[in-house]
Curated annotation (Swiss-Prot):
The keyword Metal-binding does not apply. Keywords: Cell cycle, Cell division, Cell shape, Cell wall biogenesis/degradation, Cytoplasm, FAD, Flavoprotein, NADP, Oxidoreductase, Peptidoglycan synthesis. Pathway: Cell wall biogenesis; peptidoglycan biosynthesis. Its cofactor is FAD. Residues 36-217 form the FAD-binding PCMH-type domain. Cell wall formation. Its main location: cytoplasm. GO terms for biological process: cell division; cell wall organization; peptidoglycan biosynthetic process; regulation of cell shape. It comes from Rhizobium rhizogenes (strain K84 / ATCC BAA-868) (Agrobacterium radiobacter). This is UDP-N-acetylenolpyruvoylglucosamine reductase. It is an enzyme of class 1 (oxidoreductase). It catalyses: UDP-N-acetyl-alpha-D-muramate + NADP(+) = UDP-N-acetyl-3-O-(1-carboxyvinyl)-alpha-D-glucosamine + NADPH + H(+). Signal peptide: none annotated. GO terms for molecular function: FAD binding; UDP-N-acetylmuramate dehydrogenase activity.
Length: 324
């Protein structure tokens, strides 16, 4: 992949962006955005002021310019060759709010941290959201991938998802239209989530606080929350735990370059010392190979890998064939 050239792309848009209120940043370092703190450059990063600004930008963006949405930067691994085209990063000012929206209902912006929704629910005696206190990331990503923890999932609370497509057209998707399954939704890939409407149920605030405290205490004990990590690396296979398969394959604490499978929770990959995107992805693929050779189970990535490789630093995905 060629190195990105954001100034050239920005210049090609010309006067069409003069009325855009958001921030356009050519050659934006993605290692400042992602929770892994690794990866190459975004050719052109756009941070819209609000939904209307986002729509205006999408309407003028040429169809042949790639568009990638990164949210708050969790659950993604950016490759060292960078991300071509436009990287959309929603701003906290326009998409980070959380507010009450009727009886037992909460409306949250796509990059509102999950734990802020949990806190809003607790403060107002709304049950069903305590599990969000233990999930890193933002609400848009949670709605997209049906994030869950402690036996609960996002799909249980979603009423509707507000989104904008690549053409700048607004959409409202009901829970049924989201087509939720385990760590997945059927929403079209080109939909950009802007806000999510949730509904809970009346609950005693003291009970909710106790549940949230338990979630936090457990997470601090078993997850590397103070490390540079993107969250769970692999999805749990049906009826199995990814961490257990990784542990049984001898990959707890496995190190490649500056990347490591956490010794605390071995389904968490961490940037322990200036890891590159190559280090992290190579480590993940090596773990997939080791697990398959030990158990016959082919782990699926939960973390999204974005962008292109540096020349000569490509990582071949494990295809499920044992070593000779």
């Amino acid at each position: 992949m060629k190195q990105v050239n954001g100034e050239k792309l920005l210049a090609s848009l010309g006067d069409s962006v003069k009325d855009i209120r958001g921030r356009l940043t050519p050659d934006a370092p993605m290692d400042r955005v992602t929770w892994f703190r690794a990866g190459g450059l975004a050719e052109l990063m756009f941070q819209p002021h609000d939904t209307d600004d986002l729509i205006d930008f999408l309407k003028i963006l040429p169809d042949d310019v790639p568009l990638t949405v990164v949210g708050v930067g969790s659950n993604i691994l950016v490759r060292d060759g960078g991300i071509p085209g436009v990287v959309l990063r929603l701003s906290a000012k326009g998409f980070g709010s959380v507010e009450l929206a009727g009886e037992n209902r909460i409306l949250a912006g796509a990059i509102c941290p999950d734990k802020h929704v949990a806190a809003m629910a607790m403060d107002n005696g709304i049950g069903g959201f305590h599990f969000y206190y233990g999930i890193p990331g933002g609400i848009g990503g949670a709605a997209r991938m049906n994030a869950g923890a402690n036996g609960a999932e996002t799909c249980e609370r979603v009423i509707e998802v507000h989104a904008v497509d690549r053409k700048g057209v607004k959409h409202v998707l009901t829970n049924d239209q989201m087509g939720y399954t385990y760590r997945h939704s059927a929403a079209a890939d080109d939909l950009i989530f802007t806000h999510v409407l949730f509904e809970g149920y009346p609950e005693d605030r003291t009970k909710i606080r106790a549940e949230m405290d338990a979630v936090r205490a457990h997470r601090e004990t078993v997850q590397p929350i103070r490390e540079k990590t993107g969250g769970s690396t692999f999805k749990n296979p049906d009826g199995l735990s990814a961490w257990k398969l990784i542990d049984e394959a001898g990959c707890r604490g496995l190190v490649i370059g500056g990347a490591q499978m956490s010794s605390l929770h071995c389904n968490f990959m961490i940037n322990m010392e200036q890891a590159t995107g190559y280090d992290l992805e190579y480590l993940g693929e090596q773990v997939r190979r080791e697990v398959f050779e030990k158990s016959g189970v082919k782990l699926e990535w939960e973390i999204k890998r974005l962008g292109g490789f540096m020349p000569g630093r490509e990582v071949r995905p494990f295809q499920g064939v044992t070593t000779e």
